[in-house]
Regions:
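Long, low-complexity C-terminal extensions of enzymes
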Residues: 85-109
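Alpha-helical bundle/repeat cores within regulatory domains of eukaryotic proteins
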Residues: 55-61
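Activation of the activation-loop gatekeeper triad in protein kinase-fold domains
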Residues: 1-6
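Active-site activation/catalytic loop segments of kinase-like enzymes and analogous catalytic loops
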Residues: 8-46, 61-84, 92
């Protein structure tokens, strides 16, 4: 259960939210966050393949583009702070999706 969004979600949900929405490219790419996360799951006894973890992470990253758009629609773009937040949030989200080639997931629908 995700108490922030009050919904049942994939384990990679919070990881994707943090990494794709909050981290700048250099920090995002400095470490294999999905592998690190997966190793922690495995160390706690979770049986889950890295490939499945990466696939679900990509799905979550694509999903969070919606969050970025919704949040940006509520910002005051008339001031520099709101404009900078919107540019950062959308920029991080779109860069992440491009790096992950997550738009290709839409071809499978």
């Amino acid at each position: 259960v995700d108490f922030q969004a009050t919904c049942k979600s994939a384990p990679e949900h919070d990881l994707a939210y943090f990494v794709t929405q909050s981290l700048k490219r250099d920090v995002r790419n400095a470490k294999d966050w999905v592998r690190f996360y997966h190793e922690e799951l495995i160390s706690e006894g979770v049986e889950y393949s890295l490939e499945d973890c990466r696939a679900r992470y990509r799905e979550c990253a694509l999903y969070f583009l919606c969050y970025a758009v919704v949040i940006c629609s509520a910002l005051d773009l008339g001031n520099e702070r709101g404009k900078l937040m919107a540019e950062t949030l959308l920029g991080n989200s779109l860069e992440s999706i491009k790096e992950l080639e997550a738009f290709k997931l839409l071809e499978t629908l």
